[in-house]
Amino acid sequence: MSKVFGILLYGSYAKNEYTKRSDIDICLVGVDRNTYLEILGKLGNKYDIKIFEELPLYIKMEIIKNHKVIFGDELELSEHFYKFRKIWRDMEKRIRENQFNSVREKVMLRRRFNAKKEEILG
């Protein structure tokens, strides 16, 4: 196990909101691709296993906020997550400002954009 910095449970099981249909989400922190594939081969389809460092930032933040440590030192993991929390703080406002209120709004703006693009480019 020393090839893995941390193993976290996240998602519905970590929040204690799981149902019969819920999968078990496991996140490997500080693991190389070969070790990941080795673990995946041993566990098969029992778990949904992801590499923390390869996930989108918003999912990383959800994991940081709502996880349970299966393996690893909580303090060391917290220190490891510091840089991701800092990046999120720096980007959160821009990310939130670029969200749409609804799918309808997104589609409407996309159509307006495409119409303008067509008008300009011909």
Curated annotation (Swiss-Prot):
Mg(2+) 1 binds at D23, D25, D48. It comes from the Archaea. Keywords: ATP-binding, Magnesium, Metal-binding, Nucleotide-binding, Nucleotidyltransferase, Toxin-antitoxin system, Transferase. A motif (GSX(10)DXD motif) lies at residues 11-25. InterPro entries: NT_sf, Polbeta. The keyword Nucleotide-binding applies. Probably forms a complex with cognate toxin MJ1548. Belongs to the MntA antitoxin family. This is Putative protein adenylyltransferase MJ1547. It comes from Methanocaldococcus jannaschii (strain ATCC 43067 / DSM 2661 / JAL-1 / JCM 10045 / NBRC 100440) (Methanococcus jannaschii).
